[in-house]
């Protein structure tokens, strides 16, 4: 990545660490994400059958589900297993619900690859076309003289060598221009270097050649023939489909893509994607580093362990896995803290469906009603799973004597009623509801929470949050999750909310809240500790996944030999360990708040608000300091 883009990324990270709220980076924001709409009646396309009817034992699937649920680095959201176009296992891990679309992240790169395949089959593009020729009007004199031979195939295989990558998108609105003017490492075609902007440029090429957004180009060619109606794909500030990320898709619709590819591009007997493109895209054209994947990379498609198998792979656990020789397709959505193929979740799947799978396959196993019921019950347990409520302790941790088991309802309701009408003003407003990772992914930045209130009305418990000038009331599930809407700068997101009351070792009342972003990989958690007879509270926030990913990206920037001398002095003067600590405190912040009565705004608080505003301005100025 060029120095300008790196510095902009560092400025944004410093803004987070110094408590800046509101829009950051140099990319314009305009609300675009659509509300999902009705999820009460999820659409199903594939028939549901007993696994044994497709030659796979229910016991095998039960064991795999249990391993996935127990895996330390895996946070499963959805799992679909199909064979021969029949669903043999479906599980939506609580609080995630059936029929809701989910962010695909890089999984959608494979769909962008399909779009390129369509355009090539229509004679409007070729693999060996020079990318700079496609955008001839954008080329300056220097590019015309010195440009390398960068082809469409180099983009498809992640071998472009172009140094404008994902982190650079915060630096401005014209990503095509930034890509075309970026330096190239080595010679295109020599080395695999994973870069989402290669896929973005494929989308830009499709728009350049067709005059329409890629998502619109795909509707009559892919989405409509497959019956995919609930689909949303983000655009960049210039109105180009992002291509390498930004797609929301339901698991059942993702399965249609896998079934089609397993069948050589056919769906319901009709050729959708050209068979030649399916074969070419699922053949090895590049060798990634082993830490990313061990089996090779095709045209925007990863190879898998079993010979002939493939993966549409997205970070944090979004996958469509296809096994053409067995007719098996597996769809996963998750919030795991891992990238690429080398991960705990896929290791578990490979254990059951990888290279060794197939020896026990039969046209139809003898049905085992007991094993099947065990599978059904396991799915039900995982779909209704809820953490066991904590013990209510008496006398502090050292002198603990178990109180009555906090099983529900009476105790939880008592605590909720006790909090009714209590409102608090934050003493630091740099923390928002929207997870930091999602703020960056969607270029949608929080204004920070100013107030929080608690209300119990007609048997329902609510938390009220004020961010900026907007107040939103969220219902909290005390005995199971509740599905509510959260609006972040006019973009709608579905939340699964749960709450649990307990006491800490000091005898203080604690409220643990979890906000699962049901369309995303992220969860937001906060532990609220009530102190001094409810006059003060302390809020301890965290999000998953997030910390490790952000710190890894930060470390790569700070240790870059080319960029280090250009960094703001605040970064050069701090050790890497100190920067890690600051970032960890940013992702897992602790905030204090004091109680205010309804409508109360004292002169002292107004002065404090002015001080907070002045501090935010100073933080912004500090964040923008460069040598």
What feature does the model see in each segment?
Residues 1-97, 120-125, 366-412, 416-429, ...:
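N-terminal leader/targeting segments and the immediately adjacent pre-domain N-terminus
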Residues 57, 123-127, 164-166, 207-219, ...:
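Structural helix-adjacent loops and short alpha-helical linkers that scaffold large soluble proteins
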Residues 85, 103-128, 155, 202-206, ...:
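Active-site SXXK
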Residues 122-160, 181, 212-245, 249:
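Active-site helix/loop module of the DD-peptidase/beta-lactamase fold
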Residues 160-235:
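A small/polar active-site loop signature that marks catalytic segments
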Residues 198-205, 243-266, 318-335:
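Active-site-proximal alpha-helical segments within enzyme catalytic domains
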Residues 278-333:
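Active-site Gly/Thr loop motif
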Residues 430-544, 552-559:
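Substrate-recognition/cap regions that form aromatic- and gly/pro-loop-enriched pockets
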């Amino acid at each position: 990545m060029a120095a300008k883009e790196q510095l902009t990324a560092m400025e944004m990270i410093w803004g987070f660490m110094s408590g800046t709220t509101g829009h950051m980076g140099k990319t314009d924001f305009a609300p675009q994400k659509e509300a999902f709409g009705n999820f009460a009646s999820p659409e199903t396309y594939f028939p549901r059958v007993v696994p044994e009817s497709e030659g796979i034992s229910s016991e095998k699937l039960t064991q795999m589900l249990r391993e996935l649920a127990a895996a330390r680095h895996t946070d499963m959201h959805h799992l679909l297993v199909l064979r021969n176009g029949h669903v043999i296992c479906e599980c939506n891990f609580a609080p995630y619900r059936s029929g809701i679309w989910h962010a695909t992240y890089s999984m959608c790169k494979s769909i962008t690859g399909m779009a390129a395949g369509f355009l090539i089959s229509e004679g409007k593009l070729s693999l060996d076309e020079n990318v700079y020729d496609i955008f001839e009007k954008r080329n300056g004199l220097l590019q015309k003289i010195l440009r390398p031979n960068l082809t469409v195939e180099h983009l498809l295989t992640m071998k472009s060598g172009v140094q404008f990558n994902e982190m650079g998108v915060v630096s401005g609105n014209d990503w095509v221009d930034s890509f075309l003017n970026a330096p190239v490492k080595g010679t295109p075609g020599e080395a695999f270097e994973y870069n989402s902007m290669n896929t973005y440029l494929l989308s830009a090429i499709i728009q350049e050649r067709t005059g329409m957004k890629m998502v619109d180009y795909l509707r009559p060619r892919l989405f409509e023939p497959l019956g995919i109606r609930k689909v949303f794909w983000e655009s960049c500030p210039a109105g180009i489909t992002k291509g390498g990320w930004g797609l929301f898709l339901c698991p059942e619709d993702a399965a249609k893509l896998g079934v089609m590819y397993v069948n050589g591009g056919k769906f319901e007997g009709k050729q959708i994607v050209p068979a030649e493109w399916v074969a070419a895209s699922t053949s090895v054209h590049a060798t990634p580093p082993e830490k990313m994947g061990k089996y090779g990379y095709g045209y925007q498609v990863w190879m898998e362990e079993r010979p002939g198998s493939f993966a549409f792979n997205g970070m944090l656990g979004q996958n469509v896995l296809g096994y053409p020789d067995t007719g098996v397709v597996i769809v996963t959505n998750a919030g795991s803290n891992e990238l690429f193929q080398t991960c705990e979740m896929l290791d578990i799947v490979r254990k059951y469906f990888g290279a060794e799978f197939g020896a026990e396959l039969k046209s139809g196993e003898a049905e085992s009603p007991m094993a099947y019921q065990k599978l059904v019950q396991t799915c039900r347990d995982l779909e209704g799973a809820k953490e066991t409520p904590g013990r209510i302790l008496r006398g502090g941790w050292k002198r603990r004597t178990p109180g009555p088991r906090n099983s529900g309802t009476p105790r939880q309701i008592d605590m909720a009623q006790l909090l009714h009408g209590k409102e608090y003003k934050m003493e630091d407003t740099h923390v928002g509801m929207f997870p930091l990772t999602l703020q960056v992914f969607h270029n949608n930045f929080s204004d920070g929470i100013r107030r929080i209130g608690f209300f119990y009305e007609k048997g329902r418990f609510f938390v009220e949050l004020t961010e900026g000038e907007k107040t939103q009331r969220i219902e909290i599930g005390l005995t199971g999750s509740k599905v509510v809407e959260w609006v972040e700068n006019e973009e709608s997101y579905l939340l699964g909310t749960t709450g649990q009351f307990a006491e800490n070792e000091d005898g203080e009342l604690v409220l643990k809240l979890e906000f699962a972003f049901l369309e995303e990989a992220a969860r937001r958690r906060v532990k609220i500790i009530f102190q001094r007879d409810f006059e003060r509270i302390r809020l301890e926030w965290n999000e998953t996944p997030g910390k490790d990913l952000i710190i890894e990206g930060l470390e790569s920037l700070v240790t870059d030999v080319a960029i280090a001398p250009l960094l703001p002095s605040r970064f050069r003067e701090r050790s890497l360990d100190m920067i890690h600590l600051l970032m960890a405190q940013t992702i897992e912040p602790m905030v204090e708040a004091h109680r205010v009565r309804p409508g109360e705004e004292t002169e002292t608080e107004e002065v404090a608000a002015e001080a907070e505003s002045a501090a935010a301005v100073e933080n912004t100025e500090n964040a923008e300091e460069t040598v």
